[in-house]
Amino acid sequence: MSFDVGKDKLYIQDVTLRDGMHAIRHMYGIDHVRAIARALDEAGVDAIEVAHGDGLNGASFNYGFGAHTDWEWLEAVADVLTRSVLTTLLVPGIGTVEELRRAHALGVRSVRVATHCTEADVSKQHIGIARDLGMDVSGFLMMSHMIEPEALAQQALLMESYGAQCVYVTDSGGALDMDGVRARFQAYDRVLRPETQRGMHAHHNLSLGVANSIVAAQQGAVRIDASLAGMGAGAGNAPLEVFVAAVDRKGWNHGCDVNALMDAAEDLVRPLQDRPVRVDRETLALGYAGVYSSFLRHAEKAAADYGLDAREILIELGHRKMVGGQEDMIVDVALDIKRRAEGKRAVAP
């Protein structure tokens, strides 16, 4: 355990301007990111993550193009921060060490190197170079529900051995419950050094984002991810203003202005949501099936294009154990479902 909720301060990491990109198809304007970053900075958030939803260099036909480049978003946020640490996310194979160096030159001082939960070995080069640049580095094990706690802990151990100063349980599918979160951090404790920090990245697809984050902190996770109004993929992340209000009632040290976060969520972020970020039929299907949360908007488009129920697509993606990076398979799955339905109609008496 690297954190004691009774005496230590939580490290609040906002992901509104990175994970939140998924919720609006990476369409934040420069004025939006400036205003949101300024509000977060003034509210006392420790770190603010900025990038395309799929991390540095994520803009592509597969993942979706953004309204601006990573560099334009990062420069805009760097201009307004006075205390919060400018952070970004990099997925090896999407982002390269060249993007990492460029982000550092723009003022990024902390990076999360993200891999699928069974592929920590591909993070070695990027973690090492980030450490050489003097950056704060976290390992980010996505879709952490897909493997058993002990196996996840061994992947975390690899990231620690490469130089990660913190390793996350990353519930990308919003499929973990409190018992699953607890078991994973207990497994981390059995193999990681006490000085290696733990972090929690929750999604709200089963309405457990805040509860899971509280349990994570009770199990020693000092770094907690959250976003204003839950702005994130699927049903969103743990809503920042809700999480902070909940832990404030418990007397925990979070360092944030609760009312300022409420105002930012309501006035700056919620009006941007062209699709409400909430638990509904489709986002609940994500958590129920254990599907990567950023598949939501892609699956909804495929459902509209081919006259299907988005839930059918999401459940099938779960059956096939599709993971982040396989967005191109969503249309294939939709076509398979459509062909099966047409075949059944053709043989019906």
Curated annotation (Swiss-Prot):
What span is annotated as the signal peptide, if there is one?
none
Domain Pyruvate carboxyltransferase, by residue range, is 10-262
Q: Name one GO molecular function term.
A: manganese ion binding
User: A Gene Ontology biological process annotation?
Assistant: L-leucine biosynthetic process
Q: Where does substrate bind?
A: 18-19, 172, 201, 292
Catalytic residue positions = 22 (proton acceptor)
Q: Does the keyword Transport apply?
A: no
Report the PROSITE patterns cross-referenced here.
PYR_CT
Residues annotated as site: Transition state stabilizer: 18
InterPro entries tied to this protein: 2-IPM_HCS-like, 4OH_2_O-val_aldolase, Aldolase_TIM, DmpG_comm, DRE_TIM_HOA, PYR_CT
Q: Which domain of life is it from?
A: Bacteria
Q: Where along this sequence does the record place binding of Mn(2+)?
A: 19, 201, 203
- EC code: 4.1.3.39
Chemical reaction(s) catalysed: (S)-4-hydroxy-2-oxopentanoate = acetaldehyde + pyruvate
Identify which top EC class this enzyme belongs to: lyase
Keywords for the protein's UniProt record, in alphabetical order: Aromatic hydrocarbons catabolism, Lyase, Manganese, Metal-binding
UniProt xrefs under Pfam families: DmpG_comm, HMGL-like
Hey, which family's this protein in?
Answer: Belongs to the 4-hydroxy-2-oxovalerate aldolase family.
The record's annotation in HAMAP family points to: HOA
The protein's matches in PANTHER family, at most eight in alphabetical order, are given as: 2-ISOPROPYLMALATE SYNTHASE 1, CHLOROPLASTIC-RELATED, HOMOCITRATE SYNTHASE-RELATED
Protein name (record): 4-hydroxy-2-oxovalerate aldolase 1
Where does this protein come from, organism-wise? Rhizorhabdus wittichii (strain DSM 6014 / CCUG 31198 / JCM 15750 / NBRC 105917 / EY 4224 / RW1) (Sphingomonas wittichii)
